[in-house]
Amino acid sequence: MSENKDHVVVGYTEKPVGERPTGGKFLGYDHLHFWVGNAKQAAGWYTSRFGFEYYAYKGLETGSREVATHVVRNKQGVTLAFSTPYGNDKDNQREMNQHQSLHGDGVKDVAFAVEDCHSIYNKAIQRGAKCAYPPQDLKDEHGSVTIAAVHTYGEVIHTFIQRNDYKGFFMPGFVAHPLKDPLNNVLPDISYNYVDHIVGNQPDNMMTSAADWYEKTLDFHRFWSVDDSMIHTEFSSLRSIVMTDYDQKIKMPINEPADGKRKSQIQEYIDFYAGPGVQHIALNTSDVINTVEGLRARGVEFLSIPTSYYDNLRKALTAQTSITVKEDLDVLQKNHILVDYDEKGYLLQIFTKPVEDRPTLFYEIIQRNNHQGFGAGNFKSLFVSLELEQEKRGNLTEIVKNIY
């Protein structure tokens, strides 16, 4: 259990629950696949702003006549893929164009690295998961990759990827990316250890069914949860459940809006994304201050946190003796980095502003110091900051309830 300065009490599971499920293990996140309007520009933006490097490519020059895909990754292996159709003649191109028209740029595939693709896929299908595509072996001179995919919430899919010691670039059919970003030679180096968690937003009253899907089809279990009695502001509130696999390599928080006086940032996402989808991606770092300062130098915009938050934080930390925050609080305040803690440790986190024109996808940078929570003590301060941005966009509107 965790109790922090705002007296928010949450529970999370520190150890695997029950017996190991049959079949192969989940090994972690393999990559995130975005469907976008211009894959080349999107990949370039992530190299210049977030410090990724060009990694792999598939397009006209490689014989791919229908879709172009640019893949970026960092030195630690965090991998993002961006795809754009060349036209609208084929079924897959029409699907991508319709997705773009409805949702804007967004995450289509949260791909999981797995030990046994066939086993995990077959079990999911037997338990009611809907097939996106069945198992197939992709091969080239560098080896083979086994993949299969199922639909999850909204139009998001999960691809199960078994790499079979594949030695090539990303996937069979890809080549080394021909571009190098010269800005990476002059801008600060950015280091992310891994994808910490990926958050999905659901419409009201859909969170539990989405969480249950992970438990039923993938043998995930509930790791952490909070409800609207804990997380609320004057205007809005949320509920959240975090689902994880047996080995806790993958963490998938599921959010939904709760009743409030005005439209919450969860509902704003649902409205502008036109349904459920990936709200934010959390990237783990060992040095959040250095990472954030480097990202700011590259032009990444972050939310602002009021001075009162840090005044209250200093008082709360002084009043307890369980943990010591090693970082300079003045530097954390200067960078608008949030702190949450329990009796065992603490975490540092910060959130970007939306990275699309639509107020949908954003990023979190997180540093964990023996703390496995998700910043429940910061949710209220975060919500207030998000509501200020909503108000600028004209979206912090009153909710009119239908009384009939």
UniProtKB/Swiss-Prot annotation:
Catalytic activity reported: 3-(4-hydroxyphenyl)pyruvate + O2 = homogentisate + CO2
UniProt KW Repeat keyword: yes
Cofactor(s) of this protein: Fe cation
Residues engaged in binding Fe cation: 197, 280, 364
Binding note for cofactor: Binds 1 Fe cation per subunit.
SUPFAM superfamilies xrefs: Glyoxalase/Bleomycin resistance protein/Dihydroxybiphenyl dioxygenase
GO MF entry, a single one: 4-hydroxyphenylpyruvate dioxygenase activity
InterPro entries recorded: 4OHPhenylPyrv_dOase, 4OHPhenylPyrv_dOase_C, 4OHPhenylPyrv_dOase_N, Glyas_Bleomycin-R_OHBP_Dase, Glyas_Fos-R_dOase_dom, VOC
Enzyme nomenclature, EC number: 1.13.11.27
First-tier enzyme category under EC: oxidoreductase
VOC domain location: 28-163, 194-353
Keyword vocabulary terms for this entry: Dioxygenase, Iron, Metal-binding, Oxidoreductase, Phenylalanine catabolism, Repeat, Tyrosine catabolism
Example GO BP: L-phenylalanine catabolic process
The protein's annotated pathway: Amino-acid degradation; L-phenylalanine degradation; acetoacetate and fumarate from L-phenylalanine: step 3/6
Function as written in the Swiss-Prot or TrEMBL entry: Key enzyme in the degradation of tyrosine.
Family as reported in the entry's similarity comment: Belongs to the 4HPPD family.
NCBIfam families per record: 4HPPD
Name of protein: 4-hydroxyphenylpyruvate dioxygenase
UniProt gene name: TFA
